[in-house]
Amino acid sequence: MFAQLDTKSVYSFMDSVVDLNTYVKRAKELGYQSIGLMDRDNLYAAYHFAQLAIRNGLRPLIGTEANLFYEGRKIPFRLLAKNNQGYKNLMKLATELSSGQREFTYFSDYLNDIALILPSEDWEPGMSLGSEVFIGVRPEDAGKEFDYPVVPLHTVRYFENADRSTIQTLHAISQNVSLSEVSICPMNQLLFSAKEMEEAYSKLPEALNNLNQLVSDVSYQFDTNLKLPRFNREMTAVD
């Protein structure tokens, strides 16, 4: 069964129109059993999302997108917490991100119980990233060879392609530029059905198998000790 990992919510500042209630409701209608949330550089929606998913009979997959510098290149790594300790490590990582830390090597001690996913377009041969590492692939990556196991990585930022204009407007506002200066928002970053996604990745069966194994290893036990990272009110907004 396909699991949607890389979904951005409205908590990804000016970069998504996905609200949690609609996301969970639609995911259930579209045949998902496991769904993820990977907001950019924060976990502010994580606990609420997880509780909402559980109440609707879905397995929550908690992660984040962290833009880190690896050998001078800025890479949007995806990080997935596999258990409570992984979730706590993600919270520590998010706190460091809010303080301005961006060097990949700095976070080596934070990656225990976390699956690291590198988008295929950012992969280069010989990259040394750690032990539990995957390459996030698109359907068009079929036939390519990578140094690490592959998993499907489909980004969701909106529910309809018509919402792309809203995303572009948000980007223009956040960048303080005119709409004509903003890069065109990619097509089809929407929530397809689980069946449609399995069909899209039919030429990458190893990616689907790896995804199923990865998701089956994810488990959280939520209690009052699992709290959210606080906003750093002294930090100014950065890209």
Residue ranges with predicted function:
Residues 1-10, 19, 23-34, 67-136, ...:
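Conserved active-site carboxylates
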Residues 13:
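N-terminal beta1-alpha1-beta2 module of alpha/beta enzyme domains
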Residues 43-58, 164-168:
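Glycine-rich loop at the start of a catalytic domain that most often binds anionic cofactors/ligands
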Residues 56, 146-148:
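Helix C-cap/helix->beta junction micro-motif
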Residues 63, 136-138, 153:
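Generic beta-sheet signal
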